Amino acid sequence: MSAFHDQFHTALPLLTADNYRETSPSAWEYNCIAWAAGVTDAWWWPTPGRYWPADVPREETLAAFLAAFALLGYSAGASPLLEPEVEKVALYAVGQTPMHAARQLPDGTWTSKLGSGIDIQHDTLEAVAGGIYGEVVAILGRNRSRQPSA
């Protein structure tokens, strides 16, 4: 088992050596929400001292996270299946408290930023579910030809 697995196995019990690969080294500059939004120079979270869209309530609620992604052109209700013309983001929560976001890649796999740790590509949404990130509670989509910048 790798050092990564030693550190994260309990937190992400469904992530195995067979269902993910590391794509970027650890970086403190951004987190999973920023990464899902396509941003690598800010840590997105609705707490003081972190970036959060100005017109969105600074609260750790699903409604606030949906509103933040809506400003980027995303809407809820997308399917997790690959649709080449639709860029997708999955929001994870424990209860109704958002904990994580993943973005679908053009090949249908998903990419996640693990806190201040590594970026990974994982085969399924379930690979990072079931632990500290909770379960997928919303899948958002936007047309690839209509992408407001973050």
Model-derived regions: residue spans:
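Generic structural signal for residues positioned in beta-strands
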Residues: 31-35, 89, 109, 138
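Short, charge-rich amphipathic segments
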Residues: 1-2, 36
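Domain-length accessory/inserted modules outside core catalytic folds
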Residues: 26, 42, 50, 62, ...
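Cysteine-nucleophile protease catalytic domains, especially the papain-like/related folds used
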Residues: 14-68
